[in-house]
Each structure stands twice: as C-alpha cells, then as structure tokens.
Amino acid sequence: MENTLSALRSLMASHSPPLDALVVPSEDYHQSEYVSARDKRREFVSGFSGSAGLALITKDVALLWTDGRYFLQAEQQLSDEWKLMRIGEDPAVDTWMADNLLKEASIGVDPWCISIDTAQRWERSFAEKQQKLVQTTKNLVDEVWADRPPAEINAVVVQPLKFAGRSVADKLKDLRKKLVQEQARGIIFTSLDEVAWLYNIRGNDVAYCPVVHAFAIVTSNSAFLYVDKRKVSAEVKSHLEENGIEIREYTAVSFDVALLATDELDTTSTAKDTLAEITKQAEKFVSETNKSVNGKHQAKENSNNLIWADPGSCCYAVYSKLNPDTVLLQQSPLALAKALKNPVELEGLKQAHIRDGAAVVQYLVWLDKQMQDIFGASGYFSEGNTVKKEELSQSLKLTEVTVSDKLEGFRASKKHFRGLSFPTISSVGPNGAVIHYSPKAETCAELDPDKIYLFDSGAQYLDGTTDITRTVHFGKPSAHEKACYTAVLKGHIALGNAVFPNGTNGHALDILARIPLWKNGLDYRHGTGHGIGSYLNVHEGPHLISFKPRNVPLQSSMTVTDEPGYYEDGAFGIRLENVLIINEADTKFNFGDKGYLSFEHITWAPYQTKLIDLNLLTPDEINWLNSYHSRCRDILQPHLDDAAENEWLKKATEPVGV
C-alpha cells in the first residue's frame, strides 16, 4: 500500500499541472455502485473493499470517506497510512479539501469516474480559495496498477419480452415523448441498468448485476448503443437493428457526444466501424478536452434544442464535451420509468420471490439440522442450552462462507436462477455488527450456536431480483437479544402496514421503522428501504425510504425493501428484510382526492419466533405475524418436495400468542 501511494504521489507531481491532491472514487465510468474487478480502483489504493467510499491522496496524507454501514469494516481494513473519515461525523470531502488545501491548489480526478452533480458541488466549494478541479488525461491509478485485471468479453443477451413486459419500441416511443415535452433533441444514458432496461438486453460485465458496459444516445429519430462489438452476437444485433438501434464501439461515445453537442452526430453513416479508428478519434478528442474542467465544445448558435443528461448519474467527462447553456440537467426519465414495474415484471418478481423463499427455507432446515448434529445445539425451535459434543466429525466445516455457499446451492437449483444479486452477508456474533460484512474463506468465523447469525442475501432470476434478510439463533438467546430483535420486528411490521397518501416521500415513512428502536434508545446507521430491479440491480432508485430526504414520491407499482436493524459493536447484528410492492390502497374515504397507497409483501420466509418477546408485541402485531406465517406456509409448501422440509415449515409458522 505504501509503494502504491508513493507511486501515485510521483505521478501527481509530474502531472501537468502538478496535482496537490488526487481523488479516487468508488465508481466506474457509469457511476455504478457495484463495479467490475478492473474498476475497483479505490479498493486497490486503500485496501477498503466496501461498495461505497472515496479516497483522497495529498502530498502527505491519505484519507478514506465512507458511510455508517462501513465504519467498522473500514477500521479493520485500512492500514496505518490511511485515516478514516466518517460521513455524517467528519467534514465532507469537498469541505475538507477547501479548508485544508492551499489557495489555487489543483485537485485531480478522472472525469469519467465522477458525476456532474459532484463535480459542480466541489467547484462551488473550491471557488473561495480559487482551487481547481483538474481532469486528468489518464486515470493515474491505472498507471500504477501493474496487475490490473483485464477487460472481459462477456456476451450480451436479449431479455425476452415474456420477462421484460414491454417492447423496446414502446419504451423508445415513451422516451421520445419525454424529449418533446422537455424540448430536448437528444439524451445521453450512462447508467448501465438504464441502458439494459431501455434496450431489453442483459449482460455479465459486473458481478451480481446482469448488465453490460455500454452507453446509449437517443435522439428524436435515432438510437445508439455504444458497446464492445465483440460481445454482440448475431441474435442480439438483429434484436437491436429491428428496433432501429445502431451499434457503435464503446469508445466512440466520447467522439459522438461532441458531435451531438454541435448537432453533427451522423445518424445515417456507420462508416466509423473499426475499433482502431474510433479509439484514435476518441483519444484525440479526450486529450484536447480533458486538460481542465473549463474545456467545452460549444453548440451551434442557432440550436435551441437541449441535450438531456442526468446530473446524478452522467459522468463529468460527458458534460465537459457539451455546451452548458444547452444542457438539460435533470433526472433521467428512465429512472422513474424503470422503477414503475409493468404487470409482467410484477408477476415475475412475485414468482421469483416464492422460489427464493423456498430456497431460504431449505437452507434453514439444513442449517438447523447441522447445528444440532454437529454442535449439540438446541436448534431453531428450542431454547435449551447447547450440549457441547466432545468430538466434532464435520464432513463440512460450518463457517460463514461454507454455509453461504450452501444457500447459493439451494438457490441455484431453482428455475431461472442466474446468480447472486450481491455478495452474501453471512455473519456470526460480532461480525453481524459490521453492517455490510463480507466473509472471506481465510478469515471468516465458524458458526456458533450460542451467537446470533444474520444472513442478508439475494439472487438474480430471469423473472426478478431478490433480497432478503433473516436473523436466527440456534441456542438460548438472552433477554436483551430478544428485546432488540422484537424492536426491529415491530418497526418492520409498522412500516409494512403503512397506508399513506399519494405524493408521500420515503423519508416521511422512515420514522415508522425506527420508533420502536428509538423508544429504547436504539437506532441504525443505514436507510430503511431501496427499490429493487427486475433482473437488474438489487439497489434501484430513484426512490428511497431513508432518514436522508429525497424528493421522489412513492408510487403504485414501485418495489421497495423494508429492512430495519440494530447493531451492537462487538456483540451481534439484527436485521429483518422483505421486498414490498406499492399498491393503491382501498380506503374507506379519500380525503383531498389524493388517493392512498399501501404495501404488499412478496418475500416469504418465517421469522424466528424463539427470538421474539411476545410480551412486547401488541395484539395487532401478533395477528399480523400469525397471518404472515399462515400465508408463508400456504405459499411455500407446494414448492417443498421433502416431507421433513414441509414439517419444519409448518412448525416454524405455527400461531403464537393464542
């Protein structure tokens, strides 16, 4: 790590202009949350492997910013050369740079790895001291990363209409209506899931996310896909061409954005067809325009139409090639269109979650038996003390990794399975307090029947993406552990039962999940709910349920998770998570003619009643729990062929408090 920092500082000093600081974001050229191995630049320089964070390297310090989900993980992974900066507690990165760097300091960043919003916010922070945000002509981390993984050539595939629910033609038609409404003659898409959704394609370029590295440009009469053509089969080419989509090389996007800015994008010729020619043109253009953030191509004076770019997801390199006076900086219309699931997508999600729930039950049945047979645990249902066995003859060592591999195996046996939707969080005892803990085979813990076990996992199926968290104990939980679990469950129930008017933002509902914890002086450092894709990203916007405000109303046909938690450092973690669909509510009245909304659970797996202190639940909460368990049993039993599994599920969903 020390050698890496030294090498970067040497490049910073020799850069033109010399750099006083270098920013290394987590994101790739598409502002992705999850990135491919070759794009994990921040992880390479810092050693921190969390999905969110930003590294800043100056001449004499190295700092890492991350949010509350990763405080513990960052403390464990950062070496002595690095200082952890806690988002929400320490100064924001732009504030720190403005306050601590010298007047007229030059701060370098790869403009492809930073959003328009972020870059402009930083420029405002730097203005008082005349500090400059400098676009590096090359990514400096790539220059020192000797064994950087090579780019993979993964095939693009068509997402069939029977799963997508809407044709590309219909999606393009709706999109072009939006362009007319906003007086825009073109729009640029850089988010991988938006490109995949719009063109009904999927890929395998990013682990856990069925997307392909690609850009898209759509105008009033043309559509382009920028992708490594080696990934495109004859079938995919035919699918795209039938929908009027021209395929161009991935690296051509830089050149074509500049042509779009000056209204010279050639919408008829496909002569620029070779990778070598496109790369040469793109590199020439980048070298001319990336010298500073002020290098912009101006649109023609007689052009009154706008170019639409999403400031939150579009990279600054793209914006730097446009005339700022003719750019419409507004959220992508696809963000909301993708979040509003069509009937086929909703049905697919429901079916995927049923199969996924069956896999989770099979896993719990297997794990319960292993814990009893190997460790002498009292098991999932009983609260007796663990009877330690003198000799443990384990054919399979029960570690956080080996048991999560077993869970993946159960999922892999299900119809339409294509992989996991994120790295499984399989955590025992104190590891559960690391909110996004990712176990490694070399260092992970063994399961312990006397400690809480939390698993947060999900899968990618052709008809939907899943995400579920359950927390269990195979021994005798303490009264404190029960009280904490019950508080989390109460918040989970309260949010899932909410009825609210149209126009309500997720921020307004977040408190419902936290109140039972707050009453006990407890809380959690993460959001409560996120959207989920339809065989796409497991984290999907634009809506959220969070303590952080976001002005995006919840709407009917959106999906959102319900996942409160509680984490006690050095002891345990508790989280419960279901995926919900937002529906129109059938209310007795309709005050203000607003219309009201409610949630529908589509995740099916039992809550461990042994961990619940029933004295802390209200009669209504007990009724809800029993009703959910009854439906869970009815829905999952047809998908369990083994009699022992059915018997286990029946016992796990027996009514309580009656």
Curated annotation (Swiss-Prot):
Binding, Mn(2+) 2: 467, 530, 563, 577
Disruption phenotype: Increased root nodules number in the presence of M.loti probably due to a slight up-regulation of nodulins expression (e.g. NF-YA1).
Superkingdom in the source lineage: Eukaryota
Keyword presence, Protease: yes
UniProt xrefs under InterPro entries: Creatin/AminoP/Spt16_N, Creatinase/aminopeptidase-like, Creatinase_N, Pept_M24, Pept_M24B, Peptidase_M24_C, Peptidase_M24B_aminopep-P_CS, X-Pro_aminopeptidase_P
Gene3D superfamilies referenced in this protein's UniProt entry, alphabetically: Creatinase/methionine aminopeptidase superfamily, Creatinase/prolidase N-terminal domain
BP GO annotations: nodulation; proteolysis; response to symbiotic bacterium
Induction: Induced rapidly after rhizobial inoculation with M.loti, peaking within a day and remaining at moderate levels during root nodule development.
SUPFAM superfamilies: Creatinase/aminopeptidase, Creatinase/prolidase N-terminal domain
Compartments where found: Nucleus; Cytoplasm; Cell membrane; Microsome membrane
UniProt keyword annotation of RNA-binding present: no
Cofactor note: Binds 2 manganese or zinc ions per subunit.
Binding site for a peptide: 69, 436, 530, 539, 563
EC number: 3.4.11.9
Cofactor(s), names only, from the UniProt record: Mn(2+); Zn(2+)
Catalysis performed (reactions): Release of any N-terminal amino acid, including proline, that is linked to proline, even from a dipeptide or tripeptide
Key words of the record: Aminopeptidase, Cell membrane, Cytoplasm, Endoplasmic reticulum, Hydrolase, Manganese, Membrane, Metal-binding, Metalloprotease, Microsome, Nodulation, Nucleus, Protease, Zinc
Molecular function (Gene Ontology), one example: metalloaminopeptidase activity
Subunit organization: Homodimer. Interacts with N-1-naphthylphthalamic acid (NPA). Interacts with NBCL/BOP2/COCH around the plasma membrane and in the nucleus; this interaction disturbs its regulation of the nuclear transcription factor Y subunit (NF-YA1).
Family as reported in the entry's similarity comment: Belongs to the peptidase M24B family.
Function (record text): Catalyzes the removal of a penultimate prolyl residue from the N-termini of peptides, such as Arg-Pro-Pro. Aminopeptidase that binds to the auxin transport inhibitor N-1-naphthylphthalamic acid (NPA). May play a negative role in the regulation of PIN auxin transport proteins. Involved in the coordination of the symbiotic nodule developmental program; prevents the formation of root nodules by regulating the expression of the nuclear transcription factor Y subunit (NF-YA1), a key nodulin.
Listed name of the protein: Aminopeptidase P1
Native source species: Lotus japonicus (Lotus corniculatus var. japonicus)
Gene behind the chain: APP1
